[in-house]
Amino acid sequence: MSTTDDTHNTLSTGKCPFHQGGHDRSAGAGTASRDWWPNQLRVDLLNQHSNRSNPLGEDFDYRKEFSKLDYSALKGDLKALLTDSQPWWPADWGSYVGLFIRMAWHGAGTYRSIDGRGGAGRGQQRFAPLNSWPDNVSLDKARRLLWPIKQKYGQKISWADLFILAGNVALENSGFRTFGFGAGREDVWEPDLDVNWGDEKAWLTHRHPEALAKAPLGATEMGLIYVNPEGPDHSGEPLSAAAAIRATFGNMGMNDEETVALIAGGHTLGKTHGAAAASHVGADPEAAPIEAQGLGWASSYGSGVGADAITSGLEVVWTQTPTQWSNYFFENLFKYEWVQTRSPAGAIQFEAVDAPDIIPDPFDPSKKRKPTMLVTDLTLRFDPEFEKISRRFLNDPQAFNEAFARAWFKLTHRDMGPKARYIGPEVPKEDLIWQDPLPQPLYQPTQEDIINLKAAIAASGLSISEMVSVAWASASTFRGGDKRGGANGARLALAPQRDWDVNAVAARVLPVLEEIQKTTNKASLADIIVLAGVVGIEQAAAAAGVSISVPFAPGRVDARQDQTDIEMFSLLEPIADGFRNYRARLDVSTTESLLIDKAQQLTLTAPEMTVLVGGMRVLGTNFDGSQNGVFTDRPGVLSTDFFANLLDMRYEWKPTDDANELFEGRDRLTGEVKYTATRADLVFGSNSVLRALAEVYACSDAHEKFVKDFVAAWVKVMNLDRFDLQ
């Protein structure tokens, strides 16, 4: 923000907005804690998207509001908008088809299957950094074009749903038949802080494709959605871009066919914009002056809009009918020979040297130009595997249409989780493997059935530790980002989850529970696994002198192996699970940061994380049966001993390994080793925020509160994937 232009005309009034010396007195100004301690634990990540930031209040029900929507009228308004060209941002060829497709694509395209974060599900394109990414130039205009429609329909349609629906309507208006549309994306009201966009400090910093396979990053350069369209690091080489394309689309869960279909389909309509050098382009929306009102990238070149627009710096039109669906992308790709050239802005692109002028100008009907392509478009011709698929689509346009329809639906719905979350009249009936489909329920256990099942579990010989551990193993795969994982489906009993090291308890416990399920035939295995946790916790609470009934909602089903994509479910295997004192790799962040990461995926607050760790430690749920963090002389009792002993100054802690991952607590007087611990344990005494929470549960009057809080947090985790209850 410019202090000369944006301080309420202070120069004209003669008043300075600050005291002499220029000190900023506003809240949050000045040197912050993270400036002093940049490695400070990000406990604040667990405070995101609370009711304090939500203007609609905790009683707002989006599904209920959506049911009041005149869906046909909304689509009609979107269709009319496509050709309602506005002078402040004129439409290419009189149509916003390409712009809205790009908006939807770039909203959904931030999704990464490796950690489930990103994607279009929360409408994050409204906020920084995405609203100001170099790859999202001019999408601020697309969102402003949509505002009158959003204003008209209000809370009956979320921004997140509207962005994707606008892209769908644009495709349909071009003559393309989409696969369907599922609404249900709920808006949030602040930027996601948990998404790791990378460590780079400068936009468009290049990353090697191999690095993408090791980190949850979706693009080859900071600030891009996928790959650099000029080739890796502006190389201009189509073949060298193949690895980058596979890495980025692969991180979204796309195979080669889906990748080719998405690139070609996305480039069948619309154009890129590079009328002049980027030096004409002003600040992005987040850095623009206050009078810009959230719009950015104002251009000083000519009119700055229409034929003078600068977006990517590339000036490419792929097809002869850029507002109507066709197979011209593949026809042009293989029909002509391509030579490297540069756009008016100086960006590397390719032109069909032997083609006539067959491409219409977007604003002057009397003008034509030669077909042009991006460097990465030609990758689909020159990479051997991509070329096979591209030629098949060239010769079979219907196969291309079907592949793109399905890939587009996957792109725009991948982060929504199971189909149970979809709402609206255009939800496809077909179940797709990437939706983690579930069968219809076979059981409807009565209250009497549940009582009998609990008795059978209690009499099975399983320990409290085993019962609680197996329930946690089943439910804790849930990821709040893409709503995958969780206890529903009992996929703990299927590959790959049953073979994960962290789930070693399953080999001992599942046969017992499977026998109970088979013998009683009253409930699904998924329900029985969760019910085992209920039995274990109730027994542990009773042993602590607290009688409590753990809430249990039956209705889970058992997935089949053929409904489970092993490769995609393998991505849910935790690198670390601090709740079970599990850490598979030491080369990825710190143990305590990974604990925060896991808690954030489980949508837990800091108090919920704290009470769960403390309770699970005294119940002996470490994945390997170790005594690390088991700060109690009475394991299996749901006590506050973890907190009381951790904060007890009688004990002094010292590391026992070179990596500072393992510790022992010795009596300060005798030197005797009393307890052992990991970083996931000691962080509740070392971090000031977590220590403050631990102190609550370490107090002498906290026991009953602790049990109640533990049960509430536990039930929350068990029901995270019960979208039928939400």
Swiss-Prot record:
Give me the reactions it catalyses: H2O2 + AH2 = A + 2 H2O; 2 H2O2 = O2 + 2 H2O
Entry EC number(s): 1.11.1.21
The source's superkingdom equals: Bacteria
Sorted UniProt keywords: Heme, Hydrogen peroxide, Iron, Metal-binding, Oxidoreductase, Peroxidase
How is the co-factor bound, per the entry? Binds 1 heme b (iron(II)-protoporphyrin IX) group per dimer.
| Region annotated Disordered, chain positions | 1-33
Gene Ontology molecular function, alphabetical? catalase activity; heme binding; metal ion binding
The active-site annotation reads 106
**Site features described as Transition state stabilizer, chain residue numbers:** 102
Tell me where the cross-link Tryptophyl-tyrosyl-methioninium (Tyr-Met) (with W-105) is found. 226-252
Note one Pfam family from the annotation. Answer: peroxidase
S-adenosyl-L-methionine: is it a keyword of this entry? no
Required co-factor(s) are: heme b
Coiled-coil annotation reads none
Which BP terms from GO are recorded?
Answer: cellular response to hydrogen peroxide; hydrogen peroxide catabolic process
Q: Residues that bind heme b, according to the entry?
A: 267
What GO CC terms are in its UniProt record? cytosol
Report the sequence similarity comment from the record.
Answer: Belongs to the peroxidase family. Peroxidase/catalase subfamily.
Subunit structure, interactors included: Homotetramer.
Function field: Bifunctional enzyme with both catalase and broad-spectrum peroxidase activity.
Per its record, how is this protein called by name? Catalase-peroxidase
* Organism field: Salmonella typhimurium (strain LT2 / SGSC1412 / ATCC 700720)
Traced from the root, the source organism's taxonomic lineage reads:
Bacteria, Pseudomonadati, Pseudomonadota, Gammaproteobacteria, Enterobacterales
Q: Which gene encodes it?
A: katG
